Every structure is written in C-alpha cells, then in structure tokens.
Amino acid sequence: MSKKIKRLSNRRVSKNAKFFGFFLLIATGLLILIMGLRLLQIATLKRVNSHNLTTATRQAFMQEQMVAATRGRIFSTDGEVLADNSTVYDLYAVLDKNQFDGKKPKYVQDKKETAKKLSSVIDLSEDDILKRLDSNKLQVEFGTAGKGLNIDQYNKIKAMKLTGVGFIPQPARYYPNNRMASHIIGLTNSITNAFGKNTLNGILGIEDTRNKSLKGKDGVKDYLGNQVSQGQNQVKNGDNVTLTLDEKLQTTLENRMDVMFDGTKAKSATAVLMDSKTGKILAATQRPNFDPNSQDGLKDNWVNLLNQSTFEPGSTMKTITLAAAIQEGKWHPNDTYQSGSLNIDGGRIVDAFGQNEGVLTYREGYWRSSNVAFAHVEQSLGATTWKKYIDRFHFLEPTHSDLPNEASGSISFQQAIDQANTAYGQAINVTTLQLLQAYSAIANNGKEVKPYLVEKVADSKTGKTLYQGKTTTVGQPITAATAKEVRKYMTDVVNQETGTAKQYDLRDAGYQISAKTGTAQISENGRYLDGLNNDIHSVMTIVPEENPRFIMYVAVRQPKVFPDPNIQLTLNKVFRPVMLQALNDSKSAVKSKTNEVKLPQVTGQSIDDARGKLEKAGLRVAVVGSTGRVKTQSVSAGSYALKDQLIILKANGKTLLPNMDGWSLAEAQRYANETGFNLKTDGTGFITKQSMEAGQEVNGQSVVSVELKEKE
C-alpha cells in the first residue's frame, strides 16, 4: 500500500515539475520576446524616454573628442596686449555619501567648517553656504558667488584641502589694463557651444564686431585621440586683432580723464584723439567706464558714447556752417550785424547768456561764438543749400568705424527757426565719430576720412596679415582752399583775447592750433534744461593749424562742480598733455623708425635665455614669476617695438619686484596689473622712488607706492 502511495506522489511531483518547467520556459520566452521588441524599437527609433540616443551619443563622443579653439588676442598699435585669455573656476560641493575614491570619502564631511572657510573667500555668508550644504541634493553650486573665481581665489580654496569641494575650469578673458578703453575693446560672455562646452562670445566693442575672427573654430580628435589635421574638423585658433590705439597716449588720456571726471562730478565725459590724415583713432575713452575683468560699473553703462549716443553738438557745428558759407561765396567776414537776439518766424534766437555785444563783424561773431551771426549765415545760404552741406559732411548716417550698433543721428528741419538753429548746433543730433569725420575734411584740405579702430587682423599661428586697416576717403565736401581758410579763422578763436578757446593756446610750446568750443544745451521732454551744469561743454581742435596731424575732441556733460573759473580750463587739462605727447611722438617718428626692433619669439625659453635675447636687442625686460619657462610676452613675436621699450614676460613661481627707477607710469601700471599688486602713485612723469626694495616678493596683497617726476 505504502509503495503505491509513494508512486502516486512521485508522479504528482514529476507532473508539477513538468508544469513549472513549461511555465518557466513560456515566461522566459515572453521576456526575451519583449526585450527583443524593445531593443528593435530602440535600434529603429534611436529614442529612450523621449531622449534621442543618436544625439546623446554624438554629444558625449564629441564632448570627449572636441579640441577647443583658443580665442585670439587684442593688441594696441604699439604691440601691448589689451585682451588675453585666462581660466576661471566654478565652485561645487559633492554631498552624495556614496562618493569614494578607494576608501577615501569624496563628499563634504564637516559642513560647518567647510562653510566657514569658503565664506572667507567667496562673496556668500557662512549661513547661506551652510544652507546649500544641508540640502538633500547630491551636488550643489554656490550661485554667482561661486562662479568665475580667479586664480587667487582658486589657490586659496585649494590650499584649504576641503573634502568634497571641487572646481570646473572655464575659459575666460583677461584685460591687463582693467578699465582702459573698455567700451572700445569690449567684453565677452560664456556660451555653451554645439559640443556642450563653454566658449567665449563677444558682446561689446571690438570683441563683438570682430568676434568671428577672434573666436576661431573648434575641432575634433579622431578615434585614436589625434587632432584632425585637415578638412572641416580641423581646429583653427582665433586670429589676433591689432587696434589703432597707442597704449602710451591712451594711458595719458585715461589718467587725465580720471582727474577731470572726478573733479567735475559730471554725468559723463568723452575724449578722442584722431590722426587727421589717416582717420586712425589713436586714443579714446569715456566716463563712466567699467572694468571688464570684474564688470564693475557695467550695469547701466553699456552705451558707447563714441558712436551709439547722439547729442546736439552746439557751437562746434558753426565751423561746418562757416565752411559751407566760404565754399558757396556767402561768407563776408567784415560785414556787420547786431548781436544779442534775432526773431525768425515767431521764434527767437539769442546769443549765449542773452548777451548783447553790440554791432560785430561776422569774423568776430565766429571767434566769440555768436548764435545770431550763424543764423544770419544760414539764411544767406538758404535752407536747401545748407542741408546739402549737412549731407555732404556725412551727418545723419553711420560712419561704419569698427564699433557695433552705431546711431545715425536726427534733425528737425521743417521750420525756418529749426533750419537756423542747426547752423549753430541745435535741432540736429550727431555722434562723436560723425563730428570727428566732418572735421577731418577741414583738417585734411577738403578730404573727409573715415575714423577707424582696427589696424589689422593676423593669423595667430603664422602672423600672416588677413585684414589691413586703411584710410578711406568718404568724400570731399569742400576744396583745399576753403579748408585752409576755415582753419585760419579757427586760430582767431584761440589767439583773440575774447576768443572762446584761448585756454588751449599752444604757442608757448611752438604750435599754432585751430579750435572751436561748444556749449550745447540738453533737451528733455521737449524743452531745454537751464544752467551751465545742464550743458555739454566741449572743444574740437586741429593741431597744428598748418599741415595738421591731429584732431582732438573733449566733452563733459552736466558737470556738477566747476573746479576752474572757466570750464574750458578744465577741459584743457585733458587736451594739453595728450596733444603735446602726440606731437612729440610724431616729431620723433622718423628717428623712431631707425630704432625699431622686431620682437623675437621667446615663449618656451628659459627666463635667462629670453631676457638675454631681448636685452641684446636693446629692450628692457621685466618678469612676472621667477621659475620655469616663459609662457607669454607682452609684445607678440614679429611685432615691432622701440629700443629701450619695456617687455613684460610671464613665467611661473613667485614674483620679485624689479627696480622700477626711470619707468613711466604706464609701464609701472602694466606691470602691477600683470602681477596683481596695488600700485599707488604720487606725481607725474617717471619713477624716481619706490616704497619696496627691488628683489622683494610681491603678490595680490602687496601695496607698492612710487614717486614720479617729469624729466627736466
């Protein structure tokens, strides 16, 4: 009996086993079928959970294989670096407790201590940092306070050896001269490119208009990790751009503008020096400006006052009216008129401050800057003829002078009163570059030349010139004879006792100049503001009067303080030192050609070898760093420098302060910017004394004071 039961039990077990095996086989088959169908779907559609696998795979591969192009540098015409490349760092903290390197934890362990230490370096409170570290996220960042950290901040945090704290390096732009010509040189921001990596993109100034040349083209590596050497995937580093700006003149202009702007507490100020024969802008700046490294001062300050801001030019426009009248035979300098006021079709024109100087000749009316005189001149010309000259001098149209978003200007010319107003600079709005361009016809014997800023664009690898800036004649609105006659009348404005530009007289330095001042009212909500502190005070100069070389414009808008008895005395403190420096430089230009040195390539060499090679060529050398090989040179290889010019080399290691005796302020400031120490100055000219001895280490915390004196 028991054997029978056992046989039945075995049969039941066997039957169950077969059933389970059959079920398992069916289930496995279904699972394989489902997985197969899913894989077939993925292979066909190449999508998972709405993610495109082809794109994701390509991006992952390309991100690994991308070779980033190096952005080109920007130089001054004398070879000094104005914009360079650097690296900044984005800070992050790992909170995921599963992150280990072997047995070592790679996440933040002591959150309170980490918050305390980080708060001493980044602009975020200890409590705010701790809140981020106490979050439930696997990894956190620190907002804008943790982005774009400079090398000093990076080194400080790195030295703290904080577990779980890391950095993501990002490309950045470095501007060695900080605020110098900031609106001209411009600015970049960081954008994510097609490969998913950050790259620099120009958004202001030359960085913007020459972005295509500067940025270059990213490349890729092949599957072996080698850079592709030909075809569309080859990396092409950005080209270098050289500007027409002269770094020495620019430095002098910036320093003088700082003093003037701080002293007047003005709303804004502008100054430009242009080569009248070529149109090259040799120096230009505006206030307020900004620091492109920190972006301090940028918030409400994006407008370039050279080409984007329009204004009524005031009495500087009278010179254009004078030129038109002479050209048309309508200028009668010895004829007389009644000054003070003039009624035209129900409108009233008055001279400055409502003054009535009695009966004046038209010649005297020009040097005294009489509005009434030039209203009469416009009426003599006729509105149609006068408008023809406004167009011939290329007002109301962009100059296309290498800067972005240029304004065209505007005019009110319907009524007789408006037509008369334009003759002395009201009812017409112009840009600074338009005014300079118009005056170039007077300085350049009738030939009107376009202002320009880009000297050349060159391949950063070979040095081959890809674009060469050149003089462009945009027209000839007047004859050479007319231009010379206008310049003669402009000397009256300087030489006559009642001339409005007598403050700018350079005859004591051996130069006769031509000049015209301007006091332009500012219109708001359909009416002119009252008071000298609500005007634009300006001067336009042509130097020298005979065979001119330079045009210079200086203007200050709405000064709150008048540090001198006459605002023109204040503007002269900008004009005189810059113009005399430019004249002295041009006088020695012929000599300089024989003293030029073509810069050799010294990057990659030892400091001693590089120094020896440059000093042998007659150049002075200062080094930032003290160990390793030379990484960069301040004047690029192949460029020309004058004998005895200071060349700054950058290497590694600590920096030892050089003997700066005899250095110019510009040289000392450049070296301080490269090194990071704070330079304090007393006086002008050349360094005669320094507070720290040569050979002492300097860094970002150092303060070096220098005394300067003019050479006798």
Please report, for each region that a protein language model flagged, where it lies by residue:
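Periplasmic/cell-envelope proteins involved in peptidoglycan metabolism and beta-lactam response
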Residues: 1-293, 384-392, 565-581, 629, ...
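Residue-level preference for non-acidic, small/hydrophobic
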Residues: 38, 79, 157, 184, ...
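Second-shell loop/turn segments in exported
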Residues: 60-63, 94-108, 115-118, 138-147, ...
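Extracytoplasmic
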Residues: 67-70, 77, 86-88, 162, ...
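Soluble non-cytosolic domains of exported or imported proteins
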Residues: 69, 105-112, 147-151, 200, ...
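Beta-lactam-recognizing serine transpeptidase/beta-lactamase-like catalytic domain environment
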Residues: 83, 276-309, 323-556
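Conserved SxxK-family serine transpeptidase/carboxypeptidase catalytic domain
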Residues: 143-160, 170-183, 459-572, 585-600, ...
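Ligand-recognition elements built from short beta-strands and adjacent flexible loops
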Residues: 524, 554-568, 576-712
